[in-house]
Regions:
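An acidic, gly/pro-interrupted, aromatic-rich
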Residues: 1, 8, 21-187, 191
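Beta-strand segments within the central parallel beta-sheet cores of soluble alpha/beta enzyme folds
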Residues: 9-16
Length: 191
């Protein structure tokens, strides 16, 4: 903000910062190899991709909307309305229209509790290689494709989570520097 909202100056600040230049590797790999030859301790953790369900759950957690309740009946989360209202053929007839759970506490539970309906896939989760409900899946495919980035930029679910995240930050903090610090902590999981 001090530099007149210049993106070029922001990029320079980020790319020349000590934090950006740090490595995710352990500073003394030899001693770590002696103490933990099988790599079972928490001293080392190689970065990995999040799977579709983890991405949705992380967005709900950051926005403050995640219901952490464990167990219970399956929930019906929000999905793209164009897909929800699409007629589906089941056993020679037409299935009823998909309706998400009416209360946010119900539909914002972890994705592992989401009801899976054959013939109806959530486009957001599908973009990130969630296996279909039609067949068993021994190993997930991992891909990096343009629709993933476009989904994170344009999906209605992502925009709703971003608005809820902004509302959470404004509710918790008073000034701009506190908001930015808290946003950084929450978005990177350091809270």
């Amino acid at each position: 903000m001090k530099n007149g909202w210049s993106v070029k100056k922001l990029n320079h600040l980020i790319l020349t910062s000590e934090t950006y230049r740090r490595s995710s590797r352990h500073p003394d790999p030899e001693s770590l190899a002696e103490k933990d030859p099988k790599g079972q301790l928490y001293a080392r953790f190689l970065p990995r991709r999040l799977v579709a369900e983890e991405i949705r759950d992380a967005m709900l957690w950051v926005s403050g909307e995640l219901n952490p309740r464990v167990g219970g009946i399956p929930v019906r989360p929000d999905i793209n309305p164009e897909v929800a209202f699409q007629p589906r053929q089941i056993m020679g007839g037409t299935a009823s229209v998909y309706e998400p759970d009416p209360l946010p506490e119900q539909r914002n539970r972890r994705t592992i509790y989401a009801e899976k309906l054959r013939g109806l896939r959530d486009p957001f989760l599908e973009a990130f290689n969630q296996p279909g409900p039609d067949a068993s899946c021994e190993l997930r495919e991992s891909s990096t494709v343009a629709p993933q980035a476009l989904t994170l930029l344009n999906a209605e679910e992502v925009q709703d989570r971003a608005l809820a995240f902004a509302a959470r930050l404004l509710k918790e903090n008073r000034n701009d520097s506190e908001i930015i610090k808290r946003a950084f902590e929450l978005a990177l999981g350091r809270a």
